[in-house]
C-alpha cells in the first residue's frame, strides 16, 4: 500500500502511504542502521495500527538474542521465548481502536537450500503456540507472553504474527471486505 495510486475516498482502492500498513525497523535514526535493520530482519509490519511496538527475545544457556539475531545453544536445550507487543489505546486512521485478539509463535526448521525452489512454503513451518488474553499479562498498553520451546535438536527460526480477528490463518480478502476489521501484524524470523 505504500505505492498509493488512487485513494479509496477518491474512487480508488488504495490507502495513503502509512495510513493502513506500516513497516517498523528497529534501528537508530541513521540511513545505515535502518538499512542494516532491514537486511538483518529487525522488522515488523502491521496493518491498521494493530500494534506499535514488538520485541522478541530468546534465551538459552545463559545467552540471549533479540529479533533479527541468532542464538547459539546446545542441541536438546530448552529455549525461552518472550514476546512483547504494544497494543496502543490510540485510534488509528479509521478512528477505531483495534485490540490484539491473538498472537501466534511460529517455528520452522532451517535445513539449507530448498530442494524445490518453486515451493512457496517451508513444509516444516508450524504454529508452536497460539496465545490469547487468557495466556498473556498486560503492563499498560504492553502485552507480554512467554513460551518454552523444549528440546530443540536442530537449527530453527521463529516468527511472530498476530491478529485482531478470529481467523486461524490469514486468508485472501473477499471483495468488499472492510480492511479495518481484518488486521494483522508479522515479524521477520
Indicate residue ranges for each PLM-predicted region:
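C-terminal functional module detector
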Residues: 2-189
Amino acid at each position: 500500500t505504500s505505492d498509493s495510486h488512487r485513494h479509496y475516498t477518491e474512487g480508488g482502492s488504495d490507502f495513503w502511504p502509512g495510513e493502513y500498513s506500516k513497516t517498523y525497523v528497529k534501528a537508530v535514526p541513521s540511513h545505515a542502521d535502518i538499512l542494516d535493520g532491514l537486511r538483518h530482519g529487525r522488522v515488523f509490519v502491521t496493518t491498521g495500527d494493530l500494534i506499535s511496538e514488538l520485541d522478541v527475545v530468546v534465551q538459552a544457556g545463559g545467552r540471549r538474542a533479540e529479533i533479527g539475531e541468532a542464538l547459539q545453544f546446545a542441541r536438546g536445550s530448552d529455549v525461552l521465548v518472550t514476546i512483547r507487543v504494544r497494543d496502543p489505546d490510540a485510534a488509528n486512521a479509521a478512528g477505531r481502536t483495534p485490540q490484539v485478539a491473538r498472537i501466534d509463535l511460529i517455528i520452522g526448521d532451517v535445513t539449507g537450500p530448498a530442494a524445490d525452489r518453486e515451493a512457496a512454503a517451508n513444509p516444516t513451518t508450524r504454529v508452536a503456540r497460539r496465545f490469547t488474553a487468557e495466556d498473556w499479562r498486560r503492563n499498560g498498553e504492553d502485552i507480554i507472553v512467554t513460551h518454552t520451546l523444549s528440546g530443540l535438536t536442530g537449527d530453527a527460526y521463529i516468527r511472530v504474527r498476530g491478529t485482531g480477528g478470529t481467523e486461524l490463518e490469514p486468508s485472501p480478502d473477499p471483495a468488499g471486505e472492510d480492511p479495518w476489521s481484518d488486521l494483522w501484524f508479522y515479524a521477520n524470523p
